[in-house]
């Protein structure tokens, strides 16, 4: 049995299936990333695709034997979803996409992500950037 957090997998309530949530800096995805996620979800019969509060997209309900195969197919960073570290940095659209944006929150969030994502800390740390 995979331990919680091992191989970037999180055990689900049923204690038999897992979720994986690739690192998606500031929640910004491309059509290619969405296709990869959808293709993996179909191929490995994920129970659901779930948008997380950390602006990631989780493939939920995966079989233990499929976890490593999913990561190989996705070819994406596992990111820091568990442990005592800086988790995914969240950001609003800011001036890039929002008419109310007055600051480049996505740009700042991406910079913070490059600098701090996954950095070990005494406790889990979450960051958010607002541009309005």
Could you say what each language-model-derived stretch is?
Residues 20-131:
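Small-residue-enriched alpha-helical segments and adjacent helix-cap loops
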């Amino acid at each position: 049995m995979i331990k919680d957090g091992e191989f970037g997998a999180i055990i689900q309530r049923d204690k038999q299936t897992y979720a994986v949530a690739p690192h998606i800096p500031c929640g910004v995805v491309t059509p290619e990333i969405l296709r990869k996620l959808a293709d993996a979800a179909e191929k490995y019969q994920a129970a659901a695709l779930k948008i997380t509060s950390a602006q990631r997209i989780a493939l939920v309900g995966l079989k233990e034997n499929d976890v490593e195969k999913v990561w190989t197919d996705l070819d994406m960073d596992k990111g820091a979803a568990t442990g005592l570290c800086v988790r995914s940095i969240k950001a609003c659209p800011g001036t890039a996409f929002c008419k109310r944006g007055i600051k480049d929150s996505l740009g700042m969030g991406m910079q913070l992500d490059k600098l701090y994502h996954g950095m070990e800390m005494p406790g889990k740390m979450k960051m958010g950037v607002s541009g309005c």
